[in-house]
Amino acid sequence: GYSSAASDVYKRQAQTPEREEKPKAKRIENINLHEHELIGYDTYREIIEELKEVPGIEVFRIAVSYTGRELYAVWLKPEYEGYLSLTKRLARVPSEVINARHHANEVASTNASFMLLKKLLTEDVYKELPDKLNLILIPMENVDGAAIHYELQKEHPTWKFHVARFNSLGKEFYRHYFQQDTIHSEAMGISRIYEKYAPDMMVDNHGVPSHEWEQQFSGYTSPSYKGFWLPRSLLYGYFWYVMNPEYKGNYDVNKVMEDVIADKIAAYPEMKALNQEWSAQFEKYAHAWMPKLFPANYYKEMINYWIPYESNPAHGYSSIRYPWITTVAYTSEVADETAQGEYLNLCARAHVAHDEVTIQMLMEARNVMDCRFTEQDGTILTSYIRKRPMIVSR
């Protein structure tokens, strides 16, 4: 019967000697993270394999693409002895997922992921991060597109290559998030991470063309892409938020995030200067003439777009689909199609800057706990619930 079979399995497991895990000893400072070089899929995999030997993090596969390439996530894992209950951690501290390279020709976010990870593992200010935040990095989501893009840029290293924007089937696969069965299997990575970590915040690091382009005059471009004729800023962002009054607290957190990002970027003279220069050009040659086609919402010398929706269980953005779980869904955009060399590094540093200040905001957040202890019909009932959203301050 079942009990006999279970007993046999238990006996075999008891007779199996425990595997001794080799201690991790590699330092991230000794890994070549290619901070000034465009990272293709092969280089990404080499870095991932080395990161598996670095203490303080857990590197694990989250999906396999349509063509068989692997997607990985990096979790900054607390160093506890014994069993680590993720359920209890989620009830105690917030979670953030930082996704990179969803569109493969938007190249700087992969560099930024590895550069950010290095700072988080080596700087004293982040020593307590694993105790205050569940942080997960996905350095390269669109692995098939990245492989295609890397081959194309060998001949034309600064072209935009929108042909490599999507996956190997030419699909915008974010529309397949939260589906249990999809041919666009790379979409399962975000779905699995979301189910496991229930993130309070989703940050998706993207990019836009790094120079003027002519496609909007070709007669076949959709209206949405005409707006990208001219770079508007080194870095700008989108906040996807719900309008429902019961989730007003979510909007408040988004506004604080807008503020701290603007202050952080203003602290870097080179980034601030490019933001000022490009936004002035965009205003003169685009927004001032056709504000509907070329919108721009200015705040502290930054441009941000606020995209409101009613809560919708079928929406692709988690802040709209599950607003009681995800407080913020933020899309960053740097002008990196296709960036190379020192300019690529600058774009990556812009991503790192806004990622860092957001992480610091969450580390300093106040979490409201609902703790209950009751007795009912001779049974003791206890609960320990972290209420969302968290409380953040400027």
Language model segments and positions:
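C-terminal or late-domain output modules
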Residues: F161, E172-R175, N345-R394
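Divalent metal-coordination and catalytic microenvironments
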Residues: G68, R101, L137, V203, ...
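Active-site-adjacent mobile loop/cap segments within catalytic or ligand-binding domains
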Residues: H211, T221-M243, A273-D370
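Active-site/substrate-binding loop(s) of hydrolase catalytic cores
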Residues: L90-S95, A108-N111, M115-N250
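Single conserved hydrophobic/aromatic residue that forms the stacking wall/gate
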Residues: G1-A6, Y10
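Acidic/histidine-rich, surface-exposed loop or edge segments in extracytoplasmic proteins
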Residues: R12-H34, I98, Y236-N244
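Soluble metallo-hydrolase cores and metallopeptidase-like ectodomains found primarily
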Residues: E35-R89, V93
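Conserved beta-strand elements of the Class I
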Residues: S95-I98, Y330
